[in-house]
A protein has these predicted regions:
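Membrane topogenic helices and adjacent juxtamembrane segments
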Residues: 1-25
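Amphipathic alpha-helical packing elements
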Residues: 42-80
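Short, charged, intrinsically disordered terminal tails
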Residues: 84-93
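Short basic alpha-helical hairpin corresponding to helix-turn-helix/winged-helix-like nucleic-acid-binding
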Residues: 20-45
Length: 93
């Protein structure tokens, strides 16, 4: 169900990225009680942030999480848009 929700959310996501996002959602205890749509979105955002941006490097350099999120938001939205996602990051995402 999460895989189907993810494909509706991000129809152009590459297959290897899709599997990583789905695996993250399935393995996350916190997402196990979420709806498939919510689990797909939260896993997708976390995957893109931690895997495809400089977010973790910014944290290592001493930026707080909110600042690091701000600096990677535009890149994340570019990736999400390229994968066919219509939704954009909200300030709390």
């Amino acid at each position: 169900m999460i895989d189907a929700a993810l494909l509706r959310l991000a129809p152009a996501i590459p297959p290897h990225e899709r599997m990583a996002v789905v695996d993250h959602a399935i393995d996350s205890r916190g997402l196990s009680i979420a709806s498939p749509e919510t689990a797909a979105w939260l896993s997708l955002v976390a995957y893109v942030r931690h895997t495809l941006t400089d977010y973790d490097e910014l944290l290592i350099e001493g930026y707080d999480a909110d600042s690091a999120r701000h600096f990677v938001a535009a890149r994340m939205n570019e990736i999400l848009q390229a994968w066919g996602v219509r939704r954009r990051l909200a300030p709390r995402d």
